[in-house]
């Protein structure tokens, strides 16, 4: 599953 927030 993809995370709801974007990781930088």
UniProtKB/Swiss-Prot annotation:
Cell compartment(s), UniProt: Secreted
Recorded GO MF terms: lipid binding; metal ion binding; serine-type endopeptidase inhibitor activity
Coiled coil: none
This protein's UniProt keywords: Lipid-binding, Metal-binding, Protease inhibitor, Secreted, Serine protease inhibitor
Main location per the UniProt record: secreted
Tissue specificity statement from the Swiss-Prot or TrEMBL entry: Plasma. Also expressed in skin (at protein level).
Similarity remark: Belongs to the ALB/AFP/VDB family.
Function: Serum albumin, the main protein of plasma, has a good binding capacity for water, Ca(2+), Na(+), K(+), fatty acids, hormones, bilirubin and drugs. Its main function is the regulation of the colloidal osmotic pressure of blood. Inhibits trypsin but has no inhibitory effect on thrombin, chymotrypsin, elastase and subtilisin.
Identification of the protein by name: Serum albumin
Record organism: Duttaphrynus melanostictus
The organism's taxonomic lineage, starting at the top: Eukaryota, Metazoa, Chordata, Craniata, Vertebrata
